[in-house]
């Protein structure tokens, strides 16, 4: 994979010269990088020795693919006979699929679920009508509920529940240095938004309507500690407000009200019956 990375890095430096007319090793390298992302053999970010590391070259490969591929008429559905048409550069992950491909994939995708090619969907995932963008990674056992958006290159862990209308931010526009990450066993409440490379630590629970960006203050109500850019593992988080000491308007914040306990887990546990 080192040779592939070298090819992508060189192409990135010469990106102004790359277009839909480009052929040869650059196109081959980008196509291979997207294949690796799609299959899950590679991912834009991974945890190494307990810390998240972003493979910037894979993100660059995703961006280069937009220069290499022209817009074309697209239709969705098995063997291209579904709904549409659309005018886009990135094909649907499921284009040309029939029963054997879905059985090998091992996940469930209901009508209205859209996944772009270059995104990976793990075993036992359920995709309700939702959108998973290119470079995204959804790990095993996760529920992607109705109207969820998983942004470009976002990383979703194992056994996560993304409730209805949740938005997980991408990296492509506006351009972000690192992807948004939801670690294993998290529950993200309905209509919540997590964006701009924020990391939600393992086992955390966000209530309905929590909004966290890279600049949002995440306040621990018990200790007064303020976190920026990361929700500590096993936190229970609700929307809050920081009052202005001078009597002016308060500012939005997220508040850690407690750590996850047995009662919280019972309310947010995944339903194995849905994954049989």
From Swiss-Prot:
Keywords: Acyltransferase, Amino-acid biosynthesis, Cytoplasm, Diaminopimelate biosynthesis, Lysine biosynthesis, Repeat, Transferase. This is 2,3,4,5-tetrahydropyridine-2,6-dicarboxylate N-succinyltransferase. The keyword Acetylation does not apply. The keyword Transferase applies. PROSITE patterns: HEXAPEP_TRANSFERASES. Belongs to the transferase hexapeptide repeat family. It is found in: Cytoplasm. InterPro entries: DapD_Trfase_Hexpep_rpt_fam, Hexapep, Hexapep_transf_CS, THP_succinylTrfase_dom1, THP_succinylTrfase_N_sf, Trimer_LpxA-like_sf. Pathway: Amino-acid biosynthesis; L-lysine biosynthesis via DAP pathway; LL-2,6-diaminopimelate from (S)-tetrahydrodipicolinate (succinylase route): step 1/3. Transmembrane segments: none annotated. One of its GO terms (molecular function) is nucleotidyltransferase activity. It catalyses: (S)-2,3,4,5-tetrahydrodipicolinate + succinyl-CoA + H2O = (S)-2-succinylamino-6-oxoheptanedioate + CoA. CDD domains: LbH_THP_succinylT. It comes from Caulobacter vibrioides (strain ATCC 19089 / CIP 103742 / CB 15). Homotrimer.
